[in-house]
């Protein structure tokens, strides 16, 4: 099942400089809440800048769902510092509110008011707003308030250049894209390991359930949980997933990926056609009635990405210039970190993603896609179950989670040694030594620790205690915030940029109107 990559690791040991400059970026979502734990019902604060044009502070689905975006960097400590400074800046500006520290929101009733995010009067701003209306009408608004962490990761070009020479499975026409797609297929095969280790949504509000039936253990403050679950956010209860298998999206080559995704964006859906495009008052209900309104509606645990030029879609950018980096979307908010993620997680993610790049991934088909999906569901719903087994092939042969986890981590330890040699410290090796213990000791996992807190204190008390603790830390940090002046300038500039975009569109319309009447 798992390839012996000792020769590949030996090759990496001889060429350690080719993985020296890994670039990363972090996006963290968090709900603004009132001091009593209820959703904030105010608009996105003006003091935080324009969510349309601010480089680092924006909104996701709703007005109260903040999203923090770090610059890309090869320095982990810089990323963490920048993310802390973003949180500190925002905490100072919204002193009477707090940031919810969990992926799963505290829902006190089914009719919780949620304001869909707005982005001004420009064409782009309206598109973003209507797209979110579509998400609400297609999947419901509650499910779209679930928060997560997105981890962006890219290996240096020198790695891919050298890897191409030694790896016969890479396609020559675009070896970087081919390499990243190999990584993505392996994440589908083994990414549940990360969910087992760091999943932190073992419980969910009963208001998310609708008609779904699961054998939940108990009900605390309308919160339901499964005794061995890790990340209900990633299940069909929480994080809505478009069925990629039905769309025939298999990540085997970039052309077929783009073709399949374009087909979904342009194919009408019977289900979503019933919603309609506009209501009786002429207000938009969604962008279109197709299977996907746009490419970002494809919810997957990992996806290929590329920076886009103005006016360019992601698919256009990928088609022209190939894959630039990958985005991990299966990370829950770490409730034990004030910024939702810690350094140990980043170190383990680096190692695991390098490992996914080194291991050869067979081409995806419907059969092995279903096997992978079953493994993910095993971990999502019963990951900490004693003697949990994982399917190792399409014949449904199994090994225990402990066996597979330890096999993977033996490779990760060797990669850690190479990375530590580059940085002259033992951070990666230490992270491995600490994390490998999670397999034989499931009580060490984030989901187990978090569930114990929820059972003991309930979600509201636990959430508010941590939210207040983190808020105090961020307020105390503000005077020493090295980014606060930059963030103040960016806030002012973002409002100017939004206004400029809107004014340019007004001028364009006026000019076209006057020309039409000449």
UniProtKB/Swiss-Prot annotation:
Domain of life from the UniProt record: Bacteria
One Gene Ontology CC term in the entry: cytosol
Keywords in alphabetical order: ATP-binding, Glutathione biosynthesis, Ligase, Nucleotide-binding
Enzymatic reactions: L-cysteine + L-glutamate + ATP = gamma-L-glutamyl-L-cysteine + ADP + phosphate + H(+)
GO molecular-function terms, A-Z: ATP binding; glutamate-cysteine ligase activity; metal ion binding
Encoding gene, per UniProt annotation: gshA
Native organism: Buchnera aphidicola subsp. Schizaphis graminum (strain Sg)
Enzyme Commission number(s) of this protein: 6.3.2.2
HAMAP family hit by this protein: Glu_cys_ligase
Similarity-based family: Belongs to the glutamate--cysteine ligase type 1 family. Type 1 subfamily.
Name of this chain's protein: Glutamate--cysteine ligase
UniProt key word Plastid: no
Claim: Cell membrane is one of the keywords in the record: no
GO annotation (BP), single: glutathione biosynthetic process
Pathway the protein acts in: Sulfur metabolism; glutathione biosynthesis; glutathione from L-cysteine and L-glutamate: step 1/2
Upper taxonomic lineage: Bacteria, Pseudomonadati, Pseudomonadota, Gammaproteobacteria, Enterobacterales
Pfam families assigned: Glu_cys_ligase
């Amino acid at each position: 099942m798992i390839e012996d990559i000792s020769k590949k690791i030996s090759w990496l040991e001889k060429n350690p400089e080719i993985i020296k400059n890994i670039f990363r970026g972090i996006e963290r979502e968090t709900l603004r809440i009132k001091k009593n734990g209820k959703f904030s019902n105010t608009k996105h604060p003006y003091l935080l800048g324009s969510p349309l044009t601010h480089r680092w502070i924006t909104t996701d689905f709703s007005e109260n769902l903040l999203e923090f975006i770090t610059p890309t960097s090869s320095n982990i400590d810089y990323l963490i510092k920048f993310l802390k400074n973003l949180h500190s800046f925002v905490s100072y500006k919204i002193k009477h509110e707090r940031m919810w520290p969990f992926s799963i929101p505290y829902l006190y009733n089914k009719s919780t008011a949620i304001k869909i995010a707005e982005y001004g009067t420009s064409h782009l701003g309206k598109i973003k707003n209507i797209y979110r209306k579509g998400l609400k009408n297609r999947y419901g608004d509650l499910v779209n308030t679930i928060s997560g962490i997105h981890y962006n990761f890219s290996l240096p070009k020198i790695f891919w250049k050298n890897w191409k020479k030694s790896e016969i499975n890479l396609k020559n026409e675009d070896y970087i894209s081919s390499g990243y797609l190999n990584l993505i297929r392996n994440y589908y095969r083994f990414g549940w390991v990360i969910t087992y280790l760091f999943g932190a949504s073992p419980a969910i509000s009963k208001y998310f359930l609708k008609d779904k039936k699961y054998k939940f253990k108990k009900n605390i403050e309308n919160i339901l949980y499964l005794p061995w679950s890790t990340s209900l956010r990633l299940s069909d209860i929480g994080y809505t997933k478009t069925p990629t298998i039905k769309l025939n999206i298999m990540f085997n080559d970039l052309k077929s990926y783009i073709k399949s995704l374009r087909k979904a964006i342009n194919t009408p859906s019977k289900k979503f056609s019933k919603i309609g495009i506009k209501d009786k008052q002429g207000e938009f209900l969604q962008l279109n009635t197709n299977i996907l309104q746009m490419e970002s509606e494809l919810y997957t645990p990992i996806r290929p990405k590329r920076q886009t030029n103005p006016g360019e879609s992601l698919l256009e950018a990928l088609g022209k210039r190939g894959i630039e980096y990958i985005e991990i979307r299966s990370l829950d908010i770490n409730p034990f970190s004030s910024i939702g993620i810690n350094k140990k997680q980043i170190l383990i993610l680096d190692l695991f993603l390098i490992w996914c790049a080194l291991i050869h991934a067979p081409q995806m088909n419907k059969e092995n896609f279903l096997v992978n999906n079953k493994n993910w569901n095993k971990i999502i719903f019963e990951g900490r179950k004693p003697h949990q087994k994982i399917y190792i092939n399409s014949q449904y042969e199994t090994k225990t989670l402990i066996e597979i986890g330890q096999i993977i981590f033996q490779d990760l330890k060797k990669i850690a040694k190479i990375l530590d040699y580059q940085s002259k410290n033992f951070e990666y090796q230490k992270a491995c030594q600490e994390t490998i213990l999670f397999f034989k000791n499931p009580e060490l996992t984030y989901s187990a620790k978090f569930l114990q807190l929820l059972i003991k204190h309930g979600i509201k008390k636990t959430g508010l205690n941590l939210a207040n603790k983190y808020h105090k830390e961020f307020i105390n940090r503000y005077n020493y915030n090295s980014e606060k002046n930059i963030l103040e300038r960016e806030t002012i500039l973002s409002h100017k940029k939004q206004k400029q975009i809107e004014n340019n569109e007004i001028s364009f319309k006026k000019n076209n109107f006057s020309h039409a009447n000449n």
